[in-house]
Amino acid sequence: MNRGIPFRHLLLVLQLALLPAVTQGKKVVLGKKGDTVELTCNASQKKNTQFHWKNSNQIKILGIQGSFLTKGPSKLSDRADSRKSLWDQGCFSMIIKNLKIEDSDTYICEVENKKEEVELLVFGLTANSDTHLLEGQSLTLTLESPPGSSPSVKCRSPGGKNIQGGRTISVPQLERQDSGTWTCTVSQDQKTVEFKIDIVVLAFQKASSTVYKKEGEQVEFSFPLAFTLEKLTGSGELWWQAERASSSKSWITFDLKNKEVSVKRVTQDPKLQMGKKLPLHLTLPQALPQYAGSGNLTLALEAKTGKLHQEVNLVVMRAAQFQENLTCEVWGPTSPKLTLSLKLENKGATVSKQAKAVWVLNPEAGMWQCLLSDSGQVLLESNIKVVPTWPTPVQPMALIVLGGVAGLLLFTGLGIFFCVRCRHRRRQAERMSQIKRLLSEKKTCQCPHRFQKTCSPI
């Protein structure tokens, strides 16, 4: 009796000692669906020896017979292999290609009368829909995992956005910065496996852009895409809402086929010009106040639901002098924070306001600058020269004209003076002649009268 007790205790101790050894010998390996995994098995001696790989059902997968690799009747027979070049080093690993979720199992390596267990867990991460999505659409990632596993998933977008979840991860309202390679890490039993998923967000590089131009300048609108596709087919249109117009109108419609652009219809006023290749490019011959406003370019891609959008704004500046008034105006969508100012060159601003028009009465002569600024940064500038009322110095042509006018006035004055003088002399001569005649007549008349008086009888 007493001899049996120590024996039972010894047997129990041996069982307890053996159990942890089996657990410690079991390794966990994570694999990716469609990828290749290598399950290692090493002998204590670096030499070629007999080995066998089996699954949990004790079905032989592969092994060695003599110096040749043999395969069993398992489902992995056409996808399993071993590195023969490493057998002499005591390495008898099994390589499984094109992994499937159902390959998840416990695999047993028998070598040197010992067994090594490796638990393989295969995961797959896929996008539920196409990986080419329009901006604003939702992305859903689904994790495929073997039964009985409880993995966690953490994904990071190219823009630094972190998203965590279980077997399903949803990303609403994709943005253009989400385009690129997403890195997702699957964790299970303190082991990790990393997935790389390329997501293409179909969008323009900019959601909105503003073009600032002086009146009369040529305007260039550009709409570069934030993605590249080998075959790109679709159609587009530019709608424009001028600031002075009551409603918007279509300026141009076009087709896009294999990156070639062809215009379908264009307005006559204004008559836009469009480039024939990507990026989408429009030219407005002249920036005029009646064109200032905002537009919306839409692009519908073939086999895609929804459209790409980009807003574009045009701000036009005019600096003009009318009589004694110098005016600076802008048309188009501007922020209330923008400042419009008029200043004489190399001097401080004469007038500066958060308004769309400023003016100066009786401006000094010189070069004036009309400036549209945002927090000190000049967005648009137009120069206008103010000419003085009396130019200094007087130009030679002006001297000639003034001399001619003065000479003409002097000649006219002298002519009038001499004419008046001549006429006065002539009239004076006539009067003297008349007086002489009268005096002459009086003398001839007195003699007869005196004679008659003297000779008359008493």
Swiss-Prot record:
A single cellular component GO annotation: cell surface
Membrane topology: Single-pass type I membrane protein
Cytoplasmic side: 419-458
GO MF terms, alphabetically ordered: coreceptor activity; MHC class II protein complex binding
Lipid group attachment sites (S-palmitoyl cysteine): 419, 422
Extracellular side: 26-396
Listed Gene3D superfamilies: Immunoglobulins, transmembrane domain of human cd4
Signal peptide: 1-25
Taxonomy, superkingdom: Eukaryota
S-S bonds: 41-109, 155-184, 328-370
An example Gene Ontology biological process: adaptive immune response
Keyword annotations: Adaptive immunity, Cell membrane, Disulfide bond, Glycoprotein, Immunity, Immunoglobulin domain, Lipoprotein, Membrane, Palmitate, Phosphoprotein, Repeat, Signal, Transmembrane, Transmembrane helix
Function: Integral membrane glycoprotein that plays an essential role in the immune response and serves multiple functions in responses against both external and internal offenses. In T-cells, functions primarily as a coreceptor for MHC class II molecule:peptide complex. The antigens presented by class II peptides are derived from extracellular proteins while class I peptides are derived from cytosolic proteins. Interacts simultaneously with the T-cell receptor (TCR) and the MHC class II presented by antigen presenting cells (APCs).
Name under which the protein is recorded: T-cell surface glycoprotein CD4
Organism name: Macaca fuscata fuscata
